[in-house]
Amino acid sequence: MVMGHGLGANREMGLDRYARRFAAAGMAVLVFDYRHFGASQGTPRQLLSIGRQREDWHAAIAFARTLRGIDATRIALWGTSFGGGHVLSVAPDDAYIAAVVAQVPFTSGLSSALAKGPISTIKVATIAAVDLLLGPIRRKPIGIRLAGRKRAAALMSAPDVPEGFRRLTDESETYEPKVAARVAFSALFDAPGRRAKALKMPVLYALCDDDSVAPVKSALRAAERTKHAVVKRYPAGHFDIYFDEVFEKTVYDQTEFLVSVLRP
């Protein structure tokens, strides 16, 4: 099992809970940080590049296959939020990926922008444009907040975002609250859900009905295009899935799915 987190997040932010459960079920688990974030190298720090992060997924998969005792044909990918979009995009490129778990996945930048509303989107676009123009000149990215309330100049902005994201960031010693703003433009036009038709392996979509960050309707459209899709829906918000009863239910469902697919 290869696991990666979401937007501006690192492996300290809740992934250990999932990894322990999967390991207890008999799976070997590799959890990694994207370059420029957390424990990984890469400068400038907090540079969020969609292309580089997907390259990191391929690198992590390749590394997992070098580990002793690992069956190279029974590797699963687990991604959450922005990472959920990454696994939908990366998995079709590897014919030997056995299963995918896409938890509250980012499937359409346009859908997420519409959920944010015009005020927040305009604020974010303005800062992103300044970063694109001036960042290279000053040799240092211009940052934008990852989380904020509705209408805030933040990549994720909704009433439940500040408190929900804070619960995750409190678990990390390396978390930084801002990333290079330029990613807003590439994220807007990114649509990992479009690759759903190319997914040949079983895919579990773990979706929250009250998701204010990764709209559930967009994820359901991706699931409909997935040949071997399993959809699990929970009456919860985007960040609720990492904690308490919702976590217990989702990790049970995910473990059951993974064991059934990966069992020799």
Residue map of PLM features:
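Short beta-strand/loop motif that positions the catalytic acidic residue
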Residues: 199, 205-207, 211
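Catalytic nucleophile-loop/oxyanion-hole region of alpha/beta-hydrolase
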Residues: 11-14, 37-72, 76, 243-250
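Catalytic active-site module of serine/aspartate enzymes centered on a nucleophile-bearing elbow/loop
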Residues: 229-264
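Conserved alpha/beta-hydrolase "acid-adjacent" motif
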Residues: 212-218
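Short beta-strand element of the alpha/beta-hydrolase
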Residues: 1-6
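The serine-hydrolase catalytic nucleophile loop
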Residues: 7-20, 34, 217
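Alpha/beta-hydrolase-fold enzymes
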Residues: 88-168
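Conserved alpha/beta-hydrolase
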Residues: 19-41
